[in-house]
């Protein structure tokens, strides 16, 4: 099967965005909550979704998301608030919350409280002072550890200090077993408002090298017996 190659270094930003967001899918959605303090205190609480997001490790537990910058090159409210206070929350988005999450991406004026405008109820944090979306099936409490800027790409790394999980998704709290399907999370597909469910799943067991050798040898012996 043939492939088409795109030289991204020779393409404008709009083309790179279209190609990559349509290819790197599905992407989990970070519904990021922040609160201004000090010089940015006037910004108040901000709630915004980002699909340039992922879990980066567990020792320490780290997530990363990329809020980028505004069209005029200035930081978005999320980045400004985190830069001043360091704390933020990531509410994960279920199918039931997808519509209101999408509304929170509206280009509200700087400093406008999206949660208040949209009637989104918030729940207080335990390890951080920033609230999270009360109806979210899961939420992460984070503290910024590093922000990396590459051109107009701004990547915020946050250590996860606390995790909220809806009770019906916790199968065994002592053994830390989670019913992932019960979270009913959605992901981003492409860059123009297309989303996906996470309900259609399949499992593949991880093999040890010894198990792989055994299977490979059995297959080789089967191939020879057919000749």
From Swiss-Prot:
Necessary cofactors: FMN
InterPro entries named among the record's database cross-references: Flavin_Rdtase-like_dom (IPR002563), Split_barrel_FMN-bd (IPR012349)
UniProt-listed SMART domains: Flavin_Reduct (SM00903)
Presence of the UniProt keyword Flavoprotein in the record: yes
GO MF, any single term: FMN binding
Keywords, comma-separated and alphabetical: Flavoprotein, FMN
Family stated for the protein in its record: Belongs to the flavoredoxin family.
Protein name from the UniProt record: Uncharacterized protein DR_2585
Organism for this UniProt entry: Deinococcus radiodurans (strain ATCC 13939 / DSM 20539 / JCM 16871 / CCUG 27074 / LMG 4051 / NBRC 15346 / NCIMB 9279 / VKM B-1422 / R1)
């Amino acid at each position: 099967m043939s492939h088409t190659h795109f030289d991204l270094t020779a393409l404008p930003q709009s083309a790179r965005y279209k190609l990559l967001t349509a290819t790197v899918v599905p992407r989990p959605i970070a519904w990021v909550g922040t609160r201004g303090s000090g010089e940015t205190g006037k910004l108040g609480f901000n709630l915004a979704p980002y699909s340039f997001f992922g879990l980066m490790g567990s020792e320490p537990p780290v997530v990363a998301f990329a809020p980028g910058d505004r069209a005029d090159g200035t930081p978005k409210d999320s980045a400004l608030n985190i830069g001043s206070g360091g704390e933020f929350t990531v509410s994960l988005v279920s199918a039931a919350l997808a519509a209101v999450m999408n509304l929170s991406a509206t280009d509200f004026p700087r400093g406008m409280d999206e949660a208040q405008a949209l009637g989104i109820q918030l729940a207080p944090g335990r390890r951080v002072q920033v609230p999270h979306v009360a109806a979210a099936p899961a939420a992460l409490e984070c503290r910024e550890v590093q922000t990396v800027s590459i051109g107009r790409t701004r990547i915020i790394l946050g250590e996860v200090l606390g995790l909220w999980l809806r009770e019906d998704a916790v199968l065994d709290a002592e053994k830390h077993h989670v019913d992932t399907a019960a979270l009913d999370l959605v992901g981003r597909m492409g860059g123009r408002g297309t989303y996906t469910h996470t309900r259609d799943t399949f499992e593949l067991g991880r093999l040890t090298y010894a198990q792989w050798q055994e299977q490979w040898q059995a297959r080789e012996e089967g191939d020879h017996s057919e000749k």
